[in-house]
UniProtKB/Swiss-Prot annotation:
Late-budding domains (L domains) are short sequence motifs essential for viral particle budding. They recruit proteins of the host ESCRT machinery (Endosomal Sorting Complex Required for Transport) or ESCRT-associated proteins. p6-gag contains one L domains: a PTAP/PSAP motif, which interacts with the UEV domain of TSG101. Residues 214-221 are annotated as: PPIA/CYPA-binding loop. This is Gag polyprotein. The record marks 130-131, 360-361, 377-378, 430-431, 444-445 as: Cleavage. The gene is gag. Keywords: AIDS, Capsid protein, Host cell membrane, Host cytoplasm, Host endosome, Host membrane, Host nucleus, Host-virus interaction, Lipoprotein, Membrane, Metal-binding, Myristate, Phosphoprotein, Repeat, RNA-binding, Viral budding, Viral budding via the host ESCRT complexes, Viral nucleoprotein, Viral release from host cell, Virion, Zinc, Zinc-finger. Residues 105-129, 448-484 are annotated as: Disordered. A zinc finger (CCHC-type) spans 388-405, 409-426. Residues 14-33 are annotated as: Interaction with membrane phosphatidylinositol 4,5-bisphosphate and RNA. One of its GO terms (biological process) is viral translational frameshifting. A motif (Nuclear export signal) lies at residues 16-22. Residues 7-31 are annotated as: Interaction with Gp41. Residues 186-223 are annotated as: Interaction with host PPIA/CYPA and NUP153. A motif (Nuclear localization signal) lies at residues 26-32.
Amino acid sequence: MGARGSVLSGKKTDELEKVRLRPGGKKKYMLKHVVWAVNELDRFGLAESLLESKEGCQKILKVLAPLVPTGSENLKSLFNIVCVIFCLHAEEKVKDTEEAKKIAQRHLAADTEKMPATNKPTAPPSGGNYPVQQLAGNYVHLPLSPRTLNAWVKLVEEKKFGAEVVPGFQALSEGCTPYDINQMLNCVGEHQAAMQIIREIINEEAADWDQQHPSPGPMPAGQLRDPRGSDIAGTTSTVEEQIQWMYRAQNPVPVGNIYRRWIQLGLQKCVRMYNPTNILDIKQGPKEPFQSYVDRFYKSLRAEQTDPAVKNWMTQTLLIQNANPDCKLVLKGLGMNPTLEEMLTACQGIGGPGQKARLMAEALKEALTPAPIPFAAVQQKAGKRGTVTCWNCGKQGHTARQCRAPRRQGCWKCGKTGHIMSKCPERQAGFLGLGPWGKKPRNFPMTQVPQGVTPSAPPMNPAEGMTPRGATPSAPPADPAVEMLKSYMQMGRQQRESRERPYKEVTEDLLHLNSLFGEDQ
């Protein structure tokens, strides 16, 4: 083991090997555990010689104890081994690691209570960061630290007189005198236009102060005068006078807070100048997340110098009104006056890829879903199906294929044999005749006028065609359209027969065996 195993004597090593790792467990500590603990101490920058004494182990435990709740498994194992070694040096009889930890923690708590009051950390005195501090009953001015001035300059350079500059100035100038505030303003190198605006506001407020607080006249020698507007601005007063005005017993005048208020008015005017965006123009883009839109809205609202009631109305009305259509639809479903947390939660996924995919899926589902048929259309369609007429028996309610009557031979239209209904020569055709290759006519069909039908009533004019009673009426004159229709039908029939004749002749020749074998058959 070498020197690393020499932190414990032989007797203490024997006692170490009797301590169990866990309560009720079989495994016990061995010398290799001490060697591992020495290696871990090197990682923490602690000397291995600390394990040789009780005080050294106590110092190690003080370092490791604050790290145990959030430490790794190796750190907790090292803490357990040091607790066991501490108990061995303190001649405490322990059976397992848990007992050693309890004893070590009890000793650490007792040492903490015995610590003298001078060694305990004390909080800094209140008001230690303020430029004016009270020492030995007297108020003493301390200049601003370079860190405070640097923070103010960085705030102005980074935000460029944004809405954050006003609360930042309030925090950094807390408890300052007019002298300190002028020092902060003089540190701003750029943005001299804004500085000139602040100077004009200071001059206006100083003039108003002089009008509201006129001078009472000459004061007795040695008596402190009342501050004028220029005194509050720090141009005609010293630091000592400013401190006396702020902390005197009778009628104190907080010149520092008054001057800070004037500077805030100037900064607010600069914020409006450097941020000309009106809150009415803050609208959410079609693809902008709702959270980003809310951040821009409240940033612009922060720059608005209006009454809190007006800001509350803007928040409840304009925030929902200027949202995009998708978010507006969701926000209107939240009811009246929803909280900002509810609005952010409801609009969390709007505008993202998940919401777009959901909309596309809904649109695709609607496109693939068949449109429902109205009930009236279903009844009308069912009624039409019931008017089917059978060509075989002439009855309604079924088709010819479903007819149980004997199959009628020949054409179902004219009753003749030798052809079917689709090739019936008595089909109706228009005056243009049948189409090419036996297709349907290219015009609307015309009904044939049956011959021999005479009108049942005499003509209206008796002088033109009235026959005497008892005489046989003459046949009506032939209609030229009917004659033309008949001629076209005859020509169509002839053309169809001429087209079908070659096929019939070839078929008959093929079926006739004499044409193939001659007289052998």
